[in-house]
Amino acid sequence: MNKMNYGCEGLCVVISGGTSGIGLAAAQRFLADGARVYILGRSEERGAQALCYLDEQTGKQAVYISCDVTKQAECKAAVAKIAEQEGRPDWQLDILVNSAGFYREQRLEQLTEADFDAMMNVNVKGMMFLTQAALPYLRSKSNVVNIASDAAVSGNYGCALYCATKGAVVAFTRALALDLAPSVRVNCVCPADVDTPLLAQQLADANGGYTLADVAAAYPLQRIAAAEEIAHVICSLAAPANSFMTGSIVTVDGGLTAG
């Protein structure tokens, strides 16, 4: 990872889905920049692994907080625990990154009500619940960065429900940017395929014999993104130097939706 200075030293960062993929990469960049980082997840084992990885990569320690973002009470409890650990009545959550997400490729005719609820709960309700819990601590110059997908701006085959949930994230971002202005900035990152364990699992589940090389061939840049590249965009959006950006939807897709 290239060392970059985002101006986030001393800031408090909370990242959902922070134990793997984009969320973990963002945690690494924020830690390297000198921020205090809390990562949220549902697995104590993966949380412990993530903390060890971050310590090895940065020489700095993050804090893992157990939280299922689909449960409103757990979101409130997680934020309250962070506030307690911060130990100040005037504690401010400077940067909230909503990175927790769920993907399953299913055609519309295959969907059950349970399928709908499972994806909507993580991708939409979870984001809203955690942001709602954080609201009392989002103060002047705080930032929210939501992670959507290129599927929010360009339809993908075989995943209408996923596209719908990520489209909701884009709409939520724009509305929240208006609601929280002028004190809090809210922006959204829309990545395409990213080299993460989630993508590897998707390819394995597809049973079509597709490889990462096959996926990369569809991109003008002839490759997919590394999680660190998406993390760089997240950190840049939250950086104090980008203080005039809010309500922005930033597509990071290697030119996939350019033509």
Annotate each predicted stretch with a short phrase.
Residues M128, Y137, R223-V252, T257:
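C-terminal substrate-recognition "lid" of short-chain dehydrogenase/reductases
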Residues P136, A177-P182, S243:
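Alpha-helical segment proximal to the catalytic Tyr-Lys
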Residues S149:
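Residue(s) in the substrate-gating loop at a strand-loop-helix junction
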